[in-house]
Amino acid sequence: MSGEQQLDADLGSGVEVEEFSWEDYLEETGSTTVPYASFKHVDIRLQNGFAPGMKLEVALKNDPETYWVATIITACEQLLLLRYEGYGEDRKADFWCDIRKAGLYPIGWCQQNKKTLEAPEGIRDKVSDWNAFLQQTLIGACGPPVSLLEGLRNGRNPLDLIAPGSKLECQDFRDSLSTWLVTVVENIGGRLKLRYEGLESRDGFEHWLYYLDPFLHHIGWAAQQGCDLQPPLAIKHLKSEADWQEILAKVKEEEPLPSYLFKDKQVIGTHEFSINMKLEAVDPWSPFGISPATIAKVFDDKYFLVEMDDLRPEDHTRRSFVCHANSPGIFPVQWSLKNGLHINPPPGFRSQDFDWADYLKQCGAEAAPQKCFPQSISEHQFKENMKLEAVNPLFPEEVCIATVTAVRGSYLWLQLEGSKKPVPEFIVSAESMNIFPLGWCETNGHPLSTPRRARGHKLRKIAVVQPEKQILSSRTVHEGLKNQLNSTHSVMINGKYCCPKIYFNHRCFSGPYLNKGRIAELPQCVGPGNCVLVLREVLTLLINAAYKPSRVLRELQLDKDSVWHGCGEVLKAKYKGKSYRATVEIVRTADRVTEFCRQTCIKLECCPNLFGPRMVLDTCSENCSVLTKTKYTHYYGKKKNKRIGRPPGGHSNLSCALKKSSKRRKRRKNIFVHKKKRSSASVDNTPVGSPQGSGGEDEEDADDGDEDSLTEGSTSEQQEELQEESEVSEKKSSSSSPTQSETPTPLPPDTQTNKRDAQTSSVSDDENKPPSPKEIRIEVDERLHLDSNPLKWSVADVVRFIRSTDCAPLARIFLDQEIDGQALLLLTLPTVQECMDLKLGPAIKLCHHIERIKFAFYEQFAN
């Protein structure tokens, strides 16, 4: 596998996308949405066929077997406000009902089905003769269509009656205006996928229309208008005339959809256009600009054919479309100029600049007068930078997020975001039925194409490039990441609250609180997305990557002297079976993210570049590779305060008495020291313990246990060497370390005792008290003879030793956490369990080998 393929595999694995959230997206981009009321066609769909004043028979609430006549007061989507007849203007007994659940029946249903029709108890004594009252009340009354009520009782909304397989009539709006039958393939929220009757999907003549489109009608409309049903010219040649007539006869036998479903369609008025009039138009098949056009044909007083001008030879296909007086996308001459827009000259136009006066003279035509065009709608709520959902004009089956980039009168310029293929900015009318409000797709179960950045802003799982897989050169990795970022750059929108990608630079110094191995397992980056959401996720990951999550949470918790003025977020940490919570302040705006990340790193005493918007490849600008992570532990003994480690400038002295720690301990301070070259002189000059910065701040939190020091930063040569060795099976590793040899030479009994008393151990609480010398006994035949001082061992030396033991599978942990000889000698059972996440059994086995090294160290090199 090539480097690029490996990179793609690593970066592309494990990506899981959550649902798109409009609320989060609007906050991230700092934008607003078009008001719901701006989409009249959607609002009409929700009117459901019921209207105030309609009367029906409804079951009484306290007696479902008894019914009474009620009047619709208000209709709101699927809810009706009803009032029983007899209450007059009294509203106290008005009640709401769900049209899909309530028992609603047409007037006369009770009589036909022998059901009891009786007034409610509250008004029963108000009228002496209810039959006469009803006869008088129901004179001239109207009710909902019977088919509508029957559909509701079957659990269907009015619009659901237009089900797949339903038949409609559709006018051909491309060139001929011929009317033919279409079959509904899909109905998604009133948006219909249609196929010409008699054809199959493979024939490729499917198209999408909204059910209120003026060219779509119920069965029987053509006959009412005196038109013949004829297949469009584009498909007429596919079958014989006899076949078409046979198809027509079959459809006439089927029960048609109720015509009331289309009662809210736009009424087509008469026009005043004449043949050869010139105008400006938007080509509906390519709505990316405005061009000159001509009235090519007038069908009748309602419809006419507009043809886009084309000055090329006659063999070019002419693009045309049928219009009516209120059709969108047609404008009077000079409309573009008056609105500050560019008009695209017709194909074949030779001059550089297009001028309407010269063009009309050249064509010998006249401009269509202003009175022929509908009045522009000036009152609408569309504004620039607002968000909505819109149909892709090139791929009508796709609905995308769209941004209003410009508004001219009643026309909008939209830019799609997240479309499968790039689509230029296009023009639609503010009354277009191909645009929808926020959440329309989610409400109706229609797929919504969203920007790549938006799709990934809440990733549960992000591609992680593990350290052992980074065999590629840094240049290859960098180029791969650069290409990945560039691929999404075009669809990114920077907003005030949009946080950039936050990178975890695991090669940087991780400080005393964070586990370097766990940081290396974190995602390479989080985001982009909402600042609060991204930074909350980053801090949560860091807390979980700590030796003691509760301690890091305490370091991050909200400070009363904070200067960020952000928002407080409650974060959680779990440690030793206990849960901790604290309020942490997080910045809200993108301009403060970089400094927030830097200051948080400083607070955690790690490299300022450990995480942030900047990705560190090879060399950190802070030169953090020379820092080591060494801790100085102070605690209270029973008799006096003792210090662990060597005195300043003294010889190596790792001994401390194994005394029981008190419940109340001093807080340990951590300082950074520069890493010395590992020479014989460095042992004396680089103390394992130093009084510098050792603190006196008391601490009572039970979660602040002892953490052993892990030295940061092995050289790149060591890293490469160990990467190669890691491919070798642990089982085949040598039984002896290159730095050791077994020896049966016993120690004198008194020497043995003294050495055991001098073993190094971090003092922990009572539960995790390290094992006493009696618990870990070094047998005579297990003693080591070390060829070199373990205090000077590099990470590679430590890993080689571990691989030579029966704890070889744990060598990876030592490599990941870069534990060198100094750190190895400081390890104890509690810290091995806590810092390496080992269970008691493996931890004891590992500590057994560590104690052997310590014992050999005291015997051979301590003096």
Swiss-Prot record:
It comes from the Eukaryota. The modification Phosphoserine is found at residues 764, 772. The keyword Nucleus applies. InterPro entries: Mbt, MBT_SFMBT1_rpt2, MBT_SFMBT1_rpt3, PcG_chromatin_remod_factors, SAM, SAM/pointed_sf, Scm-like-4MBT1/2_SAM, SLED. One of its GO terms (cellular component) is nucleoplasm. MBT repeats lie at residues 20-120, 128-232, 242-346, 354-451. It is found in: Nucleus. Residues 793-861 form the SAM domain. Residues 734-744 have a biased composition (Low complexity). Pfam families: MBT (PF02820), SAM_1 (PF00536), SLED (PF12140). Its main location: nucleus. Residues 696-710, 718-727 have a biased composition (Acidic residues). GO terms for biological process: cell differentiation; chromatin organization; negative regulation of DNA-templated transcription; negative regulation of muscle organ development; spermatogenesis. Interacts with MYOD1. Component of the SLC (SFMBT1-LSD1-CoREST) corepressor complex, which also contains KDM1A/LSD1 and RCOR1/CoREST. Interacts with KDM1A/LSD1 and RCOR1/CoREST. Interacts with MYOD1. Interacts with L3MBTL3. The MBT repeats mediate binding to histones tails; however, in contrast to other MBT repeats, does not bind specific histone lysine modifications. The MBT repeats lack the conserved Asp and aromatic cage at conserved positions. This is Scm-like with four MBT domains protein 1. The gene is Sfmbt1.
